[in-house]
């Protein structure tokens, strides 16, 4: 006699090979889906979202500069996936201060110090306006890539920042050193260079030799580090 066809409504054991294979497939898909989400889709909104793994692995983050606040820092809106994931044409970047609240990282350019602007009744340093204007022209309203190195005492993300120009990818800290609108960071703490300290110092030496920017002041130059020690710490 021919075998009796199995009842299609009969339950299948969880140990059935098909169930095991299906479960393994779903688990694998969820795992890699979550990894993909974390790396390419999840937005880093504030410094609190920066995990030790992101910093330790020198993870690059792509985003939009919403505001330049000083000669060596700016606000960064993370846009994971960039244009491919709809940023700028399908997914809009907020423009108002209200909508940007708790949605951006304050980026402190690594390895450099720009002249101090006027703050809290303190005078501005020579070339502080020029440095601020230069940085605004260079990055404000543009997309950049950052590599976070650390978070400083002011909750700023100390990072290498790079931007694409017609002549290729540019390191923003290096470009500021070239034109003399920043010097190599002097502080004993919070100095992050990645692997670029020697390069930065060579660029600074060349700008000094050519008397670019702040170096045109000669012996009258007070470095940003010295200025802060005098005016902000009462020395």
UniProtKB/Swiss-Prot annotation:
Top-rank taxon: Eukaryota
Residues annotated as binding Ca(2+): 113
PROSITE patterns recorded: TNASE_3
InterPro entries: SNase_OB-fold_sf, Staphylococal_nuclease_OB-fold
Domain TNase-like: 59-217
Pfam families: SNase
Alphabetized GO MF terms: endonuclease activity; metal ion binding
Subcellular location: Mitochondrion; Membrane
Keyword Transmembrane helix (UniProt): yes
PANTHER family noted in UniProt: EBNA2 BINDING PROTEIN P100, SERINE_THREONINE-PROTEIN KINASE 31
Protein name, entry field: Probable endonuclease LCL3
Native species: Candida dubliniensis (strain CD36 / ATCC MYA-646 / CBS 7987 / NCPF 3949 / NRRL Y-17841) (Yeast)
């Amino acid at each position: 006699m021919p075998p009796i066809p199995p009842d299609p409504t009969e339950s299948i054991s969880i140990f059935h090979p098909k169930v095991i294979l299906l479960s393994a497939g779903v688990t694998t898909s969820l795992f890699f889906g979550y990894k993909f989400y974390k790396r390419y889709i999840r937005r880093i909104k504030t410094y609190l979202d920066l995990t030790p793994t992101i910093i330790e692995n020198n993870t690059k983050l792509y985003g939009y500069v919403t505001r330049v606040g000083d000669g060596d820092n700016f606000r960064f809106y993370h846009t994971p996936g960039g244009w491919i994931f709809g940023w700028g044409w399908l997914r809009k970047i907020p423009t108002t201060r209200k909508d940007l609240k708790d949605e951006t990282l304050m980026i402190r350019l690594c390895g450099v110090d720009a002249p101090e602007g006027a703050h809290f009744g303190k005078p501005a340093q020579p070339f502080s306006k020029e440095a601020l204007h230069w940085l605004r022209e260079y990055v404000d309203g543009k997309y950049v890539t950052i590599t976070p190195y650390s978070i400083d005492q002011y909750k700023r993300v100390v990072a290498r920042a790079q931007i694409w120009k017609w002549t290729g990818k540019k390191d923003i800290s290096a470009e500021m050193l070239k034109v003399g609108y920043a010097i190599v960071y002097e502080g004993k703490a919070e100095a992050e260079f990645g692997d670029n300290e020697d390069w930065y110092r060579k660029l600074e030496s060349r700008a000094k030799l050519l008397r670019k920017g702040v170096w045109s002041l000669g012996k009258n130059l007070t470095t940003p580090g010295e200025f802060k020690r005098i005016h902000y710490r009462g020395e």
